[in-house]
């Protein structure tokens, strides 16, 4: 009996040990495989493999795990070169990432492991800007990017990094003023900024509980705040500090807080009553000007204060029921495109201009979104005609973007950053600066073959390509600029004073976007898969009509899990070779879910059952009672229940797990049109416009 009991215990222990030795998460293995290859497969990383393997069980060099998850990468001093790989965001359990004291070059990756607490890329040869993506990594406690070749201004991106205790940007080539969001670093203890080119004052630091501050050898000026003079370790030499007595701060002025009336927000640095009076007078004048502007225009250019329902704009929308026949448009995205060749014999779709030509082009062709030409453009039906793509000079784009300054940064993704380009005559464009490492350095064509294909894509719900720039190793695409921003901003980044999108507008956005995707899938030959459909790539024009962006760049999206982010990627798309147009349909269904619920596709801060929007919402899509509970609270119930139910039915079809059960986009468009037609007969005479004097919510 005793022997049997002993054997039972031994077997149980063996089973327990086997369960504990769980294989490393597949996505994390893939991320490390790609990283190993990108680092040029260094022999010093013992155990690492280019394909497969088990980092946790096989104890790969520098890899530490907890259970089946990789939690630390300690790779300091391995003389590593190359790049870091493009799947780092798959390492969701990683808390420590140390690549210090290596020979790494190029830009810091845009997409880093999202839950890092300690990031150390110091003592390398990294250049470019500090990535804005750091602003979303709320768990960061330590950032060390010292002793590299980083340049440009620091983005104002530190608002959410309240846990950050150590920040080291020393020995780089960073410039400009300190960002005002430094004031939000309430846990900061150590700040090293020495040996850079920072300017302005350091007043933004005065309310922080820092005990180790080094700002030596910069171009700071003004005075060292008294609050900082008692710091145990304070180094301030090599700057242009004022030798005069520092003036006392004016009553009520708090340094280190962003002022609503000042971009710098650093407070008043002069101590005279004249300056104080002047500042007060300036604020008063600004208030008067703002009141005058508000009185003159009921509708602001801001996306958050547009009066959709009482707008008096002339109707500018194509009839929602006017589906039309899809004309075939030949677009070369085939093998020739992949090889850097164009299917056309010439470059008749590309028009080169210099500075003078650019001025004429911006003045005559890129009209503002309130003029007659743009109104006519909105009413234009599908066309297979092409429009010349203008070749911009690098110097012109550098001037219009202030040398691609962080202040003009609109956003960034897995293949590059988008900047606002402002011209002296008031016109504005959007410039997508694509990562140069994505192009084969051995080929001279650069971005030209892509431009040849993109210039053929024309649809009223697709953001138009204006031109491009391929010069000195830079590859950029120039698009229309939309002041209203993206659907993502409207749904997820609005404040409590914002006017939410009405139900009618949400339906219109869904239908317009569906038509854009249908055009890519079924009017273009061969079919164009988007591979990056998400709310941040759906821009909204002056009248809140959708314009799909980032199309025709699928060659750069080797793994859609990298660029789409969590929540949008279709289940089958984990295997890049399995991506089909039906995978685009799934992503579009997720966007419709965002319109319905107002939630983001994945929210790691919610309880586990609610983190994935699709998994949480899908079981409730066919329950009419549950639908009212998951509908966006910002709608305040102002929607017809039948319309909500039909909208949910379409979503349920789009997000089917098996791609063969999802409808093609043409059927999605037809379903949305039928939904509009069946919901209210009153829409027959009003389908040409989505604006009415009184919105009856009858979709």
From Swiss-Prot:
Residues 1-22 form the signal peptide. Residues 295-699 are cytoplasmic. Glycans are attached at residue 184. It is a single-pass membrane protein. The modification Phosphoserine is found at residue 368. It holds the Pfam family LRR_1. GO terms for cellular component: membrane. Expressed in leaves and flowers. Residues 239-263 are annotated as: Disordered. Residues 404-675 form the Protein kinase domain. InterPro entries: Kinase-like_dom_sf (IPR011009), Leu-rich_rpt (IPR001611), Leu-rich_rpt_typical-subtyp (IPR003591), LRR_dom_sf (IPR032675), LRR_N_plant-typ (IPR013210), PRK1-6/SRF4-like (IPR046959), Prot_kinase_dom (IPR000719). It is found in: Membrane. LRR repeats lie at residues 93-115, 116-136, 139-161, 163-186, 187-209. Belongs to the protein kinase superfamily. Ser/Thr protein kinase family. The protein kinase domain is predicted to be catalytically inactive. This is Protein STRUBBELIG-RECEPTOR FAMILY 5. It comes from Arabidopsis thaliana (Mouse-ear cress).
């Amino acid at each position: 009996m005793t022997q049997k009991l002993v054997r039972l215990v031994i077997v149980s222990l063996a089973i327990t040990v086997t369960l504990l030795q769980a294989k490393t998460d597949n996505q994390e293995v893939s991320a490390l495989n790609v990283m190993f290859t990108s680092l040029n497969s260094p022999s010093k990383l013992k155990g690492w493999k280019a394909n497969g393997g088990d980092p946790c069980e096989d104890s790969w060099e520098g890899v530490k795990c907890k259970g089946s998850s990789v939690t630390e990468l300690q790779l300091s001093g391995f003389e590593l070169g190359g790049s870091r790989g493009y799947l780092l965001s798959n390492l969701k359990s990683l808390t420590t990432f140390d690549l210090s004291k290596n020979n790494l070059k190029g830009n810091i990756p845009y997409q880093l492991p999202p839950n890092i607490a300690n990031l150390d890329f110091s003592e390398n040869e990294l250049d470019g800007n500090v990535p804005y993506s750091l602003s979303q990594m709320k768990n960061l406690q330590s950032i060390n990017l010292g002793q590299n070749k980083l340049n440009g201004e620091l983005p104002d991106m530190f608002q959410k990094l309240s846990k950050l205790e150590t920040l080291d940007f020393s020995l780089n080539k960073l410039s400009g003023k300190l960002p005002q969001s430094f004031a939000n670093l309430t846990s900061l203890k150590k700040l090293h900024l020495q040996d850079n080119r920072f300017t302005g004052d350091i007043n933004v630091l005065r309310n922080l509980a820092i005990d180790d501050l080094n700002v030596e050898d910069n171009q700071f000026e003004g005075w060292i705040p008294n609050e900082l003079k008692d710091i145990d370790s304070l180094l301030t030499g090599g700057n242009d500090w004022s030798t005069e007595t520092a003036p006392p701060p004016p009553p009520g002025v708090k340094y280190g807080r962003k002022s609503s009336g000042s971009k710098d927000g650093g407070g008043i640095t002069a101590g005279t009553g004249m300056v104080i009076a002047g500042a007060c007078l300036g604020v008063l004048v600004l208030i008067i000007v703002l009141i005058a502007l508000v009185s003159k225009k009921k509708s602001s250019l801001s996306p958050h204060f547009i009066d959709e329902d009482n707008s008096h704009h002339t109707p500018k929308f194509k009839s929602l029921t006017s589906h039309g026949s899809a004309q075939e448009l030949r677009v070369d995205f085939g093998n020739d495109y992949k090889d850097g060749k164009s299917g056309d014999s010439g470059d008749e779709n590309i028009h080169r201009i210099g500075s003078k030509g650019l001025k004429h082009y911006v003045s005559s062709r890129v009209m503002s979104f309130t003029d007659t030409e743009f109104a006519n453009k909105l009413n234009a039906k599908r066309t297979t005609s092409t429009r010349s793509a203008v070749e911009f000079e690098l110097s012109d784009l550098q001037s219009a973007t202030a040398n691609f300054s962080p202040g003009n940064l609109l956003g960034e993704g897995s293949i590059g950053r988008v900047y606002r380009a402002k011209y002296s005559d008031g016109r504005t464009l959007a410039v997508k600066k694509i990562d140069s490492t994505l192009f084969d350095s051995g080929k001279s064509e650069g971005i030209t073959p892509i431009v040849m294909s993109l210039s053929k894509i024309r649809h009223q719900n697709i953001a138009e390509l204006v031109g491009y720039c391929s010069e000195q190793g830079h590859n950029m695409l120039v698009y229309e600029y939309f002041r209203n921003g993206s659907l993502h901003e409207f749904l997820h980044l609005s404040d409590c004073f914002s006017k939410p999108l009405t139900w009618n507008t949400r339906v219109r956005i869904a239908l317009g976007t569906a038509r854009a995707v249908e055009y890519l899938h079924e009017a273009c030959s061969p079919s164009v898969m988007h591979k990056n459909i998400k709310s941040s790539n759906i821009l909204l024009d002056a009248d809140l009509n959708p314009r799909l962006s980032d199309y025709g760049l699928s060659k750069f999206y080797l793994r859609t899990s990298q660029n789409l982010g969590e929540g949008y990627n279709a289940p089958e798309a984990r295997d890049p070779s399995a991506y089909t147009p039906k995978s685009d349909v799934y992503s579009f269904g997720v966007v419709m879910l965002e319109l319905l619920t107002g939630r983001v596709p994945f929210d790691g801060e919610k309880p586990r059952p609610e983190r994935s929007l699709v998994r949480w919402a899908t079981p409730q899509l066919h329950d009419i009672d549950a639908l009212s509970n998951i509908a966006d609270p910002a709608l305040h119930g102002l929607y017809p229940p039948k319309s909500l139910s039909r909208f949910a039915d379409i979503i349920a079809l789009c997000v089917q797990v098996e791609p063969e059960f999802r409808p093609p986009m043409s059927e999605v468009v037809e379903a949305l049109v039928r939904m509009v037609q069946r919901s209210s007969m009153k829409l027959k005479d009003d389908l040409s416009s989505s604006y009415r004097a009184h919105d009856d919510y009858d979709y």
